[in-house]
Regions:
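Catalytic center-proximal scaffold of phosphoryl-transfer enzymes
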Residues: 1-199
């Protein structure tokens, strides 16, 4: 959020919270909540989500870390679900694209995960769960093997290694969706809601 005025332009943050059960055949009315704050600090979503229990699908912003139940020393009722769109984007950053041949491996495998999701979007929970177990789980295992094997051959400072470590450090949160029919592969619903609000 930009707030032009006198002198330097002030910036703020628009936090977006979305509920949309349509992809898993839920019947709750979709809803979007926008909260504006003058700064982007983790304490803001902590305040917004005080008392919330459940799954939070978000990007890798470090300010969210204190929200999650598995954070060191924290005992909250919020479980992290990471976003595959953010992870996939790492392989399309220009410094990583210079290693284009190696980037095809994860990009193709992540694309296959999205194909599984395309087939189950809007389907009943049991069908989504079965399809993910049959089709997504083996692809996740294959991708994890590729990431581990490739990382072991790279310089730790390479941009591709950084992209891989981003995903591996979030692996439990990235793969959580595959075991829960009510979760999505990414948080693109929030991205779409943000785009509608800012255009």
């Amino acid at each position: 959020v930009l707030a032009p005025g006198f002198g330097k332009t002030a910036t703020g943050r628009l936090w977006v919270y979305v509920r949309d059960e349509r992809p898993h055949a839920g019947d709750a009315t979709p809803a979007v909540l926008y909260r504006y704050t003058p700064v982007r600090k983790g304490i803001r979503p902590q305040g917004h989500l005080q008392g919330f229990a459940g799954y939070l699908h978000a990007d890798g912003y470090p300010g969210f870390d204190k929200l999650y139940a598995d954070s060191p020393g924290k005992h909250t009722a919020i479980t992290e679900v990471a976003c595959w769109a953010h992870f996939r984007r790492k392989f399309f950053d220009p410094p990583v694209q210079r290693l284009a041949g190696r980037c095809r491996g994860p990009a193709r495998r992540i694309g296959e995960l999205y194909q599984v999701e395309d087939a189950v979007r809007g389907r009943p929970p049991d069908e989504r769960r079965r399809s993910r177990q049959e089709h997504a789980h083996p692809r996740l295992a294959d991708l994890r093997s590729w990431l581990d094997a490739t990382l072991s051959k790279l310089s730790g400072k390479s941009e591709l290694a950084k992209a891989i470590r981003y995903g591996l450090s979030r692996w439990p949160a990235l793969t959580r969706y595959a075991d829960h029919s009510g979760l999505e592969i990414d948080n693109n619903a929030a991205k779409r809601a943000t785009a509608k609000r800012t255009t």
